[in-house]
Amino acid sequence: MEKFIAELEQCRLAELEAYLKATGLSNTTLSSDEENALNAFNGKNSGGNTPCGLTWQSFKLGDLFEVLSSKKIYRANTIKIHDTQIENSYPYVVRAATNNGIKGFIIDDPIFANEKNTLSFAQDTFTVFYQKQPYFTGNKVKILKPKFAFKSPKILHFISAILQFILKPLIWGLGSTTESIAEFKFSLPLKPTAKTQTLKDIDFHFMRTFINALMKQTIQGVVQYSNAKMQATKEAISQEAPTQKDSLF
């Protein structure tokens, strides 16, 4: 029984290590920078700047991204879509609001795949997702290619969350064009030392650090839940384990 419990614990630890590796984290302990980022966003220890104790500035989407058309449009009723990724396949991104907009995976010449480390922008549903792999798209999906130097996917996670929030009130069928997408305005945090309000003053370091902190907090919650389940399993096994009785002979 002890061996069985030990195997369960090893399995749990292996899953945690795999998740940490996938997210690029080595542990779930918040660094001082990450704690400061959370405090700043929550308005703690701030100098009164708003919102969230940070200085924010409005930018046009076109200031930070090139708004590009997909290299090729794939219609779902004319292609073979795989539920899981197989060899030589790439994500097929559509206007869905879940699973990063990925409907499945398709195989075609990679020359038609859009660049990885970009954002997909659904024109009718106004959903925005970070895409970590090269990908194909369905109809009415634009590609947002960063004009700034790409340093971390976490920065694009931060920006996509901001865009998703401000675009949420827009309704299906409203429509959009390359030009109108480039004109969308949204706010980003500025560096504490910023004296101007230009692209070079955007605090990309804060964005990356803040997302890191959120990921660690999420994993901490999963670990606590997993620990509670493990303890409950141990107790259940202990109660069900047969008690050895004295021999009759």
Language model segments and positions:
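DNA target-recognition domains and sequence-specific DNA-contacting regions of bacterial/archaeal
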Residues: Q57, G62-F186
